[in-house]
């Protein structure tokens, strides 16, 4: 925010410096702030996942994680919805100021939580002493990393995560243009239809989480979600199917798949690993996921520019044929289905209990 206000001018200086590494000081400080925010966002995601697993293990774990995912989707969509209107009405720095205020609110909420968590730790410690057992919480050890990496369940969950999300998030980046070019949907509403998966995840993830808590079937649900993803991308890849209603129905199905897999996948990590290794496991999974979310959009962008230019728009920018990218997404979705099958097989072999309910009676 400071970079966009106090350092906004072309002649702005910081400690008498006008340029840093060839960039205007304001631009460089904005880069630095955004980078720090990115690191903090990942740390927060890992920490929140670990906290929820700690508080709700053996209880409504999938429901709690589903609510957390839903709230995250609300935040993401709200950011997209209000940023441009705020910038137009009050200036380009206003959305950043709003983000700063929300982050301060989050920090206050964390301090309140820390007090509550300390109380829970004391209760858990007292219960462990009374039961004659040791608390599962331990300090970080590199041995934990080794134990995680040699666990087949880790690699299957991590691969499923990166393959599944690589078929969803990169696709959403150009879904609006696909709606307009292939299906003839008006550009004023194309973005709304492209946002249906996020809306579906917001509503359905807690619902599916509640089902998993009571009935189980996590491995089967991940298998079902991956199969639905294949159907969606395969039909999108067929050139002759270009009716607008088909596109909308496929977006709704994608939203259901986008709810099924996360509602089962993230709580499954808490069944595969003890609490003492959960934070490390989530961190490693997020790390692998981000490699895919960097690599797949890069690949799709290269394919579009190299093989898929179909013409020019009135403003001179390229128009694209998305058949090849959709075939790539279909192939990745097929790989996610194979991994989901292997995970279900591993569940039977290693006794992860993924098919059992989360709520322990």
For the regions a language model picked out, list residue spans one by one.
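Symmetry-related core transmembrane helices of the 12-TM Major Facilitator Superfamily/SLC fold
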Residues: 94-113, 323-342
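Cytoplasmic helix-loop-helix junction between adjacent transmembrane helices
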Residues: 27, 33-71
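Extracytoplasmic gate region of multi-pass secondary transporters
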Residues: 151-205, 262, 296-297
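Glycine-rich segments within core transmembrane alpha-helices of 12-TM secondary carriers
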Residues: 62-88, 286-297
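Helix-to-loop junctions at the C-terminal end of transmembrane segments
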Residues: 204-217, 304
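C-terminal transmembrane helical hairpin of 12-TM major facilitator-type secondary transporters
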Residues: 218-265
